[in-house]
Curated annotation (Swiss-Prot):
Residues 1-18 form the signal peptide. The chain crosses the membrane at residues 192-212. Belongs to the IRC22 family. It is a single-pass type I membrane protein. Residues 213-238 are cytoplasmic. This is Increased recombination centers protein 22. Keywords: Endoplasmic reticulum, Membrane, Signal, Transmembrane, Transmembrane helix. Residues 19-191 are lumenal. Residues 219-238 are annotated as: Disordered. It is found in: Endoplasmic reticulum membrane. Its main location: endoplasmic reticulum. InterPro entries: TRAP_alpha. The keyword Methyltransferase does not apply.
Amino acid sequence: MKFLKVALIFSALSGVYADLEHNLRIHNDIPVEYDSDAASADIGSEDEPHQQEPKIANFLIEYDVLEEDGRISSGLIEVENGKSLSFSYNFTNSEDADVNVYAFGGSIIDMGSSQIIADIPRTDFSPVHVAINESARLLQKLPIDLPEGILYVLPHIYVDKDGEQMKVGASPISIQVVPPPLSIFNPQFLSIQLFLLGLVAAISYYVFGFSFKTTKQPVKKQNRASNSNEWLPETHIK
């Protein structure tokens, strides 16, 4: 009897082992794709987080606005719409290699909303070579055709370093855009002048014309009467 129980247990264990071996063979037939690059990246990310450090451009950009005569007490530069601002740059290269400066650009920012309301179109010019620790003078003309108010001007300078193109921003300035003075030759102003002159002429004719007629007629009759009496004898004058 004991032998029969042992035989049954042994047969059950043999079936479980055979089923387990069959399952293992089936799973071993499944191909597994292994990405060594991804694995190494995952391992690297687990050991030390990957952080991309921002590049810092070693350039010194200083500039003057040649129209600073329009600077008012609050520090703003007042400029009329339709005029231009001239930026005189002093660009210093503190990088470890020579660079070429080849374009201007920038943005116009509204002071109230801090939103970009206009872009300064990129203006390319012949590349200016600037060696290490050397400086170069650059001049930019910025036509002003903007909404009136207080705005920020953020200039950009485009630099090429060993084939790598960079856009470097300079410190912003604040400007106040005002309307241009109204010229006497402005068509709108001339039309207003003509309208006012016509209005004054019409009023003058209406007021002085009627008063002149009412005062002039009796004078004419009196003159005629006096002239006619001078030629009559005194006996006929009544």
